[in-house]
């Protein structure tokens, strides 16, 4: 069975750009850095809560997303908002209907907490596992 992504207009231009021209979304995390969010889109933006994240600490949260299948690849990048320039974000788990993002404060300096509202871009790459 072929995957139908016609509702999402995958776009490839003469400038060798690839992506979705519509179907994105945005969501803001509430309460704390481990509170899950729901966004049912193939691409979008997640804004994290500004709760303090201590040096050498990490926090993971679940993104519920009906567009994600277990064999898909989810890519994330930090758009802006990290306060100490030592913060990283990555996908730690992908499952059917969800994925988890981990935010890590990689600084070793005592008292160097991450306090920014981090904006994370994400995209779901539809994939098939053999």
Segments (PLM) and residue ranges:
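Extracellular receptor-binding modules and their adjoining Ser/Thr/Gly/Asp/Asn-rich linkers
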Residues: 1-68, 79-80, 94-130
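Short, surface-exposed alpha-helix to beta-strand junction/turn motifs within ectodomains of secreted
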Residues: 74-77
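Glycan-recognition/cleft segments
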Residues: 86-94
């Amino acid at each position: 069975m072929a995957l139908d992504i016609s509702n999402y207009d995958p776009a490839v231009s003469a400038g060798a750009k690839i992506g979705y021209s519509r179907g994105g979304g945005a969501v803001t995390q509430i309460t704390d850095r481990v509170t899950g969010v729901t966004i049912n889109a193939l691409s979008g933006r997640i804004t994290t809560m500004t709760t303090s994240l201590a040096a050498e600490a990490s926090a993971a949260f679940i993104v519920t997303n009906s567009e994600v299948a277990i064999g898909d690849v989810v890519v994330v990048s930090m758009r802006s908002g990290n306060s100490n320039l030592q913060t990283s974000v990555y996908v730690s788990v992908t499952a059917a209907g969800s994925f988890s993002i981990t935010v890590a404060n990689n600084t070793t300096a005592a008292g160097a907490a991450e306090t920014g509202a981090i904006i994370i871009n994400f995209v779901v790459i539809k994939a098939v596992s053999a």
